[in-house]
Amino acid sequence: MAEHPAPAGTSVITSLPDVSELPELGFSGWKSWFGEAARAVLRWTPAPGLVLFFQSDIRESGEWVDKGYLVQRAAEAEGRRLLWHKVVCRRPPGTISHGRASYSHLLCFAHEPRARITHPGPDVLPDAGYKPWSKAMGVDACRLACRFLREESETKLVVDPFCGHGTALAVANHYGFDALGVELSTRKVRAAKRLVLELDV
């Protein structure tokens, strides 16, 4: 990313890979990588662009891994401001889960704080929505993120540097944004190119 500066009007919607997707790093190596990757994404996004992270906590090696905290720590290191922190339910409230949290974090960071947000959206989303694949962000979560960008930012281009099957990109296109994804897996790239979502307004 450092070799390809972001154009003006860029914002990011992404979900950083889980340790299960990078087993070669080991747990401690993944935690270090996660923090550096989050910082790189935040650093790359130009003002007044926003960065939105969608992350799900896990239990690994007997400890709870709060990815929302890891992202916020990276943002503090880069001098970014947290505009909001929403919870997206992956399972109905009251569900007992083992290994992975039944909710996800959706966090929005900016270069500068904002005194007022006109269209804040809900703090808790009852369902992430349709997922084109198992690790997808969920269409409803993507819609919430894209709606906020449309109503509260100067965004023209949405970038997902870990795009997977391209859910965030497809929803961004639906909301009128140009969208660009980065993905190392050729299989996932092919899936992203094929993805078409039928969405209402």
Predicted regions and their residues:
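Flexible mid-to-C-terminal extensions adjoining Fe-S/redox cofactors in radical SAM and related proteins
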Residues: K188-V189, V201
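S-adenosyl-L-methionine
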Residues: M1-E3, L197-V201
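Core catalytic lobe of class I
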Residues: M1-V182, R187
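Conserved SAM-binding loop
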Residues: A192-K193
